[in-house]
Amino acid sequence: MREAHQDAVARVSEERLWRRHMEMARIGAIPGHGVNRAALSQEDIAARKVLIGWARDRNFELGVDAIGNLFVRRPGHDAAAAPVMTGSHMDSQPRGGRFDGIYGVLAALEALQAINEAGVKTRRPIELVAWTNEEGGRFPPCTMGSAVHTGARRLEDFLDIKDNEGVALRDALAQTLAATPDLAQRPMKAPAAAYIEAHIEQGPLLENAGKTIGAVTGIQGLRWFNIEIFGKTDHAGTTPLALRQDALRDAVNIIKALHELTHDATDTVRFTVGRMLVTPNSTNSVASHVLFSVDVRHPDPVTIDRLGKAVEPAARKAAKQCTIMVTPTLHDDPCVFDPGVVDAVERAANELKLRSMRLPSGASHDAMYMARICPSGMIFVPCEKGVSHNEAENAKSADLAAGARVLTAALLEFANK
């Protein structure tokens, strides 16, 4: 590692990085040290304004694209060169933690600031991006901002999606963009030389192995569905079971069938029903309508394709009393990260004498869409007991700083190519 690069890495401040995490954690704070910072909400807008303020204090350039992805740019001496990009997301799950997503944004800002303080000149610009609606908790599906920015999906396909309160994404997006009207407009699918995203692991592998850094090799594939069941409302006390069209009973039958479909002795398949809406949702009424989500994941492309195709037939076979509708909402194939980026992360960890290992990501991340347009990869750091999407999510400040140092070194390597 060059001496100037070593100086930049050394300037990464564990205290400053932690302090910024704690400041962001106050925006949308909920009991139990958790965070509820939904995409395109007032809390999201507040977090964006804090990040913009920190960037402006350091004279970084700012921009935003049509879906609200926020860009912070440190120029390079070759203005025509494609940037090296880094970042993650600032939105959270409804009962999320203080580090998921926001760590990648703040580690990126820390890297840019450390490079600035060291006075390092880079050929390429380095850009931080805070992606819009990675979680998909308010407006499904997930990883929306990166999917639209890279051209994998069209913004128009998402604008009419509504949250549980009936608010359309187009209106929430317009409100968010109006809150920062002075930002420069960025085009979609702008060229990038590389993309490196830092993130907490959201699993227990690093902690259990006693490693500080994960060089992520790829992301498993997933299929999302909405399953709707149409029955008939009746009185719970007077309607014989044999005469009911009980939507909730069929929902239970379908979920049981899908659990059986996805059973895997190796515990590699991931199957989740995480959201359910019941109508009329009354104790003494038979349910007339149920809507629930299905999330299936696997790292092997053949297996995830087979499971995805089997969801609807299994659901229809399991429904005994009602009619159903199965709607695919997300289709992501497994992603393999660029070997050069994986090597650079591992090399930086070794040079900094940090214990590292290679591992795949079980969760989806924006890096999987960036991998479609440029060499991409990720850096994982441990989170306590692997807990994430939970108020109890926690990470050590030393591990967060270690990941930011590896990120700084890797960014500098690509920024001078």
Named regions from a protein language model:
Residues 86, 95-135, 223-229, 238-261, ...:
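Alpha-helical metal-binding/catalytic segments enriched in His/Glu/Asp
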Residues 219, 235, 239-265, 311, ...:
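His/Asp/Glu-rich mid-to-C-terminal helical/loop segments that flank catalytic regions of hydrolases
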Residues 58, 70-103, 108:
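Catalytic-core environment of secreted peptidases
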Residues 134, 140-301:
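Midchain, well-structured core segments that form catalytic/ion-binding scaffolds
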Residues 17-30, 87-88, 355-406, 411-414:
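Zn-dependent metallopeptidase/amidohydrolase metal-coordination segment
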